[in-house]
Swiss-Prot record:
GO CC aspect terms: nucleus
Keywords in alphabetical order: DNA-binding, Nucleus, Transcription, Transcription regulation
Biased composition (Polar residues): 49-58
Oligomeric form and interacting partners: Homodimer.
Summary of the tissues where the protein is detected: Expressed constitutively in roots, leaves, stems, and flowers.
Compartment(s) of residence: Nucleus
Gene Ontology terms: biological process: regulation of DNA-templated transcription
Gene designation: BHLH27
Annotated disulfide bonds: none
Protein name listed in UniProt: Transcription factor bHLH27
Organism (species): Arabidopsis thaliana
Residue ranges with Low complexity bias: 32-47
UniProt keyword DNA-binding, yes or no: yes
Length: 263
């Protein structure tokens, strides 16, 4: 019975000791602050009180700065799981790692875009220099052969002649010296050029010329200045120069109008 009382007494004293130590550890800044504010009875108290109060103030300032930085960090990080210090720091580290990964991804995309733009500006050749020189030499040889072939060709085969297909030709006298010639022909390649050459070859005094182009026809109206002595041979002159096709001359009027229609 005495042993049990002794052990219970020791247990009680040990528990009280740890409780007292915890209270002293938690309340030492306040005790030092209060002890520094008053006068000390010991001769060393005057020297230790200002130092203790200075330490308390510096510790308070340090914790205040730390809390301010944590608040600023909490406002920057978008995802905060908890509001304690450890969670804020952990979430900040995770967010920084996420930003680093995004930076690497963007840099890779930028490099890929730059490489594509370089390929578009300067395309890469799949053959070496020797193959390129050989290819260029063959190309130049082929061009020389083609030019020789073109030189050997006859001029008549290169410049084709497109005859004028006259559909209707009408000659009308307007007075004694003025004649109106209306020519209607089918519209083909170089028809207008050939017709102009024909008119120039006649060596007639042309006052005015009017060309009208349609989908499949080309109409030309000429105002000529001629003499009456030329009137019998005017139609035959046009017929022989324009084309070698046989025409049938229809006299609508003996003195004023003569029509030439293609047979």
């Amino acid at each position: 019975m005495e042993d049990l009382d002794h052990e219970y007494k020791n247990y009680w004293e040990t528990t009280m000791f740890f409780q007292n130590q915890e209270l002293e550890f938690d309340s030492w800044p306040m005790e030092e602050a209060f002890s520094g504010s008053g006068e000390s009875s010991s001769p060393d108290g005057a020297a230790t009180s200002p130092a203790s109060s200075k330490n308390v103030v510096s510790e308070r300032n340090r914790r205040q700065k730390l809390n301010q930085r944590l608040f600023a960090l909490r406002s920057v990080v978008p995802n905060i799981s908890k509001l304690d210090k450890a969670s804020v720091i952990k979430d900040s580290i995770d967010y920084m790692q996420e930003l680093i990964d995004q930076e690497k991804t963007l840099e890779a995309e930028i490099r890929e875009l730059e490489s594509r733009s370089t390929l578009l500006e300067n395309p890469v050749r799949d053959y070496d220099c020797n193959f390129a020189e050989t290819h260029l030499q063959d190309f130049s040889d082929n061009n020389d052969m083609r030019s020789k072939k073109f030189k050997q060709m006859d001029y008549s085969t290169r410049v084709q002649h497109y005859p004028i297909e006259v559909l209707e030709m009408k000659v009308t006298w307007m007075g004694e010296k003025t004649v109106v010639v209306c020519i209607t022909c089918s519209k083909k390649r170089e028809t207008m050029v050939q017709l102009c050459k024909v008119l120039e070859s006649l060596n007639l005094n042309i006052l005015t010329t009017n060309f009208s182009s349609f989908t499949s026809r080309l109409s030309t109206t000429l105002f000529l200045q001629v003499t009456l002595s030329l009137s019998p041979s005017l139609i035959s002159l046009f017929g022989n120069v324009i084309t070698s096709t046989n025409y049938k001359i229809l006299n609508a009027s003996r003195e004023y109008c003569t029509c030439l229609v293609l047979v």
